[in-house]
Amino acid sequence: MWLQVILGRQRAVLRSSLSFRFLFGSTLISGLGTWLAVIALSVDVFDRTHSGVWVSALLIADFLPAVAIGFLLGPLVDRLSRKRLLVGADVVRLAAFILLALAVKPWQIVALAFVAGVATGFARPVVYAGLPNLVDTETLPRANSLLRTAEQLTVTTGTLLGGIVVAAAGPDVAYWLNAASFLLSATLLVQIPGGMLQEGRVASHGHWRDLAEGFDVVRRSRALLTVLLTWNLVQIGIALVNVSEVVLAKVSFKSGDFGFGLMWAASGVGAAIGALLAASLLARRSMTLVYAAAIGVMAFGDLAAALSPDVWVAVWCIALGNVGTATAIVCNSLLVQRGAPDHVRGRAFTLIMGSNFAVLGIGMGIAGVLVNAVGARWVWGISAGFTALGAIVGYALLRRTPQAVLEPAVT
C-alpha cells in the first residue's frame, strides 16, 4: 500500500511539468547507455592492453574532468545557457562514442573517454542546478527523488545489459547503443523551453571573480558547507568500500565472481529503494534528522558487512547501507538547491562535486595500499568510521542552519 502511494506521488511529479518529463526521460535514456558503455570501456581497454595501468588511466579520465570543472570552470554553468550546455554535452558524447566504435589504439579510447568525461562534468551539475526552475517548491524533493531513482536504476540495469552486450557482440555494439542514447536524450532536451532551466542571464564580472564568488557562497552558506564537509568525509568511506569490495567478496567471503556480482546487485537495489523513499521521509521528518540518520545507516551497513560471516548476510547489510546512501544524496541535492540562489547554483554544484571527486580519487589511491596491509574487513570497518564521522558533522552543522533554508515554506 505504501509503495503504491509513493509511486502515485512520483507519477504526479511527472504529470506536473512537461519540461521535467523531458529532463527525466533524458536522464533515464542517457544513463542507461552510459552505464552500458562503462562495462564496454573497461573490457575494451583491458583486452587490448592486459594492463591495470591502462584501466586506471581510463578511470582517471572519467572523473578528472569533473574535478577540473569544479575548481576552474564552474561559472560557465551559470553564465551560459544551461539548455545549450545540456544539449551540447549530449552532442559531444554522441560524437565521442561514435569515434570510440572506430578507435583502434588504447590511447584513443582513453582520450575519447576523457572528452566524454568533460561533457558529463558539465551536464550533471547543470541538471541539478536547473531542476528547481522546472518544478515548484513543494514538488522539488519528489523531483530530486525521482531523478536519483532513475539514475540508480540505470546503474543496475545498464551494467547488467553492458555485460550481456559485450559478451555477445563486443564493445563496439555497446558504443553505438550509447551514442544512440545520447541522440535520443538530446532530442528530448531541445524541447525544454530555453529559459526554463535558469531564472535569467547572469552578468560576468570576469572569470576569476565569478569563480571566487562560487567559492564564497559555499563558504558562507551553512547548508552548502555542510554538504561539502560531510560528503567529503563520506567519500573517503565510499572510496575504501569501492576498492576493497571485490577483495571482501573473493577473499574474505570466498564467494568468487558470483558473490561480487551479488554484492553489486544488492548495492543497486538498496540505492533505488533509498532514492524512492527519500522524499517521503523528508515529508515526515526534518532534513537534519533524515540526513544524519541516512549517513548513519551507511556507516552501520559498512560495519555490519565487515562483520558478516558470509556473503549471504553481507548483501542485506550492503543493501541497507545503500538505502542510506541514496537518501543522503537526495538530501545533498536539496540542500544545495535551497541554499544557493539560482545565479550561483551551478558554481555551488560544480565546486562541491569537483571536491567530492577529488577526495574520492585520493581515497581510492589510499584504499589500494590499505587493503593489502590490513585486509578488506578492516578497510570496511575504517570506512564505517569515516562515514559515522560524516553523520556527526552533518548533524552538528545542520542543527545551526536556519529552518527556512532547510525546509522553506510552501507558497
Regions found by a protein language model. Name each.
Residues 1-411:
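Alpha-helical transmembrane-bundle signature of multi-pass membrane transport and export proteins
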